[in-house]
Amino acid sequence: MHGYSYEAMRLTAELNNAFHTPEEIREIMGRITGRPIDETFRLFPPFYTDFGKNIRIGRRVFINACCCFQDQGGISIGDGTLIGHRVTLATINHGLPPDRRHVHNIAPIVIGKDVWIGSGTILLPGVHVGDGAVVAAGSVVREDVPPRTIVAG
């Protein structure tokens, strides 16, 4: 696990510390995720991830600047999804009691097709966002979002 984390830090530093064309960004993201990235993908750096290999990105996905993906539990992003500035996708949490705080609770985040995640949103472990849903800017999402709904708060 630590080897992949250090590789993700190295690759995100490469991505974030110089200008890159869209083609170069896709190539670096392919190395971060360990899989090819579709030519319709767009990302505005900087971008941060602590693992990288558990991110799956569909077609026509746009990720805006300053997003943080904690992907050890797995992150899946469906086709046509838009992700705003400073969105955090967190797939790991810690136990609440002091004697359990070093225990990781891991659950995947699944984002459906044609979803819009507003700027500053935080999705917590285990959240599924249904197709066509909108999550308003600044939301903290701890429960599943049904398809074609708008949630805020």
Show the residue positions of the predicted features:
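Terminal amphipathic alpha-helical/low-complexity segments used for targeting or macromolecular assembly
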Residues: 1-40
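Flexible, glycine/small-residue-enriched loop-and-beta-strand segment within the central core
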Residues: 47-57, 62-128
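Flexible glycine-rich beta->alpha loop in the catalytic core of nucleotide-sugar glycosyltransferases
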Residues: 87, 94, 139-140, 146
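Beta-rich strand-turn-strand
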Residues: 119-134, 138-144
